[in-house]
Structures are given as C-alpha cells and as structure tokens.
Amino acid sequence: MARPHIEPFCDRDEHFKPMRLLGFGTGMHYKMLSMDTDTGACSMTVQFDGGYKRTPGFSWSEYEFIVIEGELKVGDRTCRTGHYFYVPAGYALPEISSDQGCLVLYMYNTGEPSHEEATEHHPSAQTQLYHDVDSYMDIPWAAGNVAKPSVASGCMIKLLNYNPNSFAMTFLYCMTPNFYQDIISYHDCAEESYHLWGTSWMMQFGYVPTGGYFWRP
C-alpha cells in the first residue's frame, strides 16, 4: 500500500536504529518517518557518526537530503546546516563523509534506499536535474502564495526543487510570529512536512515541535 497518513509524529520520541543495508557502511543511523511498503520509498532522519564515510556511487531511487545539524563533506566540499541536494536516480555522488558527525533529513521518493558504488553516472540518469544549494544563505524568502486559493499572509517559502517528471515541489517554509490561519485546507497530492526548528500549532493535532512530522496522502 502507499504511505499511510502519519500525524502527529515527532522523531525526538524515537530512538535511532543502525542502517544495515548494503553499501552504506557503518556509522549511519536512522529514524523512519514514513515508508511505502510497496516501493520502499521513505523519509528518514539520519545521524552520521563522526568519521563516517560512504564510497562514491548512486541510488536506484531519486532522493533529496538537507543537512539539519553539523557538517557533511561531499567530495572536497564542506556542506553546512541548510545545504540541500536533489539527486536523480542513477546520479553518482562523490564520497561523502563527516568528521564530527551530522544530522540529515533524507527523502527517497521513488524506491528504497540503495547505494551502488560507482564513479560514473548510470547511462539513464537525468543528470541535468541534479542540483544543490545552500538554502539558508543563497535563497531569499518569498511569499507563500504559489497557488490560489492560498495560505494566509505570513507564511514564507524558499523553493528548493520542482520535479518536471512528477510536478512535485520541495520547499522550506516559515511561519512568521503571530501567523494564523483558521481554515481547513486539502491538496490533490500527497503532502509531507518536517519541522527543522520551532513550534507551530496544527488545529486538531495541537503543538508540533522541532522534529515534528506528517505525511498526508
């Protein structure tokens, strides 16, 4: 079945489990946020231990990740809190490592987590779709009214990715102080949210703290 409705949920209430899938090495731990039991697609918060290394390679699933805390080295670059990556299926990343350890949000969108050791992209990879950005420093906040009808004023977004295959969008959002919206809304697509920082209040579900998550089919 597809991913079930998950709400309310806070990953701070769960313990990390060791990642034991082939190719990911040792020193990677995860908290499962949601999973499609048919395809293996899932979202996880991941803790890399200090000294963690993963060989160059690609995944059979497209995936996205953003650094929540600490520093992650991708090849010879050091990526800090807020750095976001969209990685198409078959796109080979260089070695990743973390000297001091870091916390990362991972979203495998089309299949289960996998790592195929390689220094070249798969021939079918849509390499032109790959991108990464320091979302905290290099993208300005914009009004959240990307669709009509829209959210109330005071909800701001930073668009991180638009997927031309699925039309899915990934963005950061923030609620400014005293933001308030008292209407119930729904979407014609699945909706997923993870609280990187701060606390909000979600109607019948109450307060959602840092680490709060939902998946709405």
Whereabouts are the PLM-identified features?
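Short coil/loop residues immediately preceding or within conserved phosphate-binding loops
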Residues: 28, 43, 62, 155, ...
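Short, flexible domain-boundary/linker segments around small modular repeats
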Residues: 41-50, 156, 164-180
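Active-site-flanking structural segment that lines cofactor/substrate pockets
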Residues: 29-31, 37-54
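Glycine- and acidic-residue-biased ligand/ion/polar-headgroup-sensing regions
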Residues: 49-52, 58-74, 175-205, 209-210
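Ligand-binding loop in jelly-roll beta-barrel domains
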Residues: 28, 78-79, 89-118, 189, ...
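Short acidic-glycine-tyrosine-enriched beta hairpin
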Residues: 73-94, 201-217
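A short, N-terminal "cap"/entry segment at the start of jelly-roll beta-barrel domains
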Residues: 1-38, 112-167
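Residues at beta-strand starts and edge strands
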Residues: 40-42, 61, 66, 100, ...
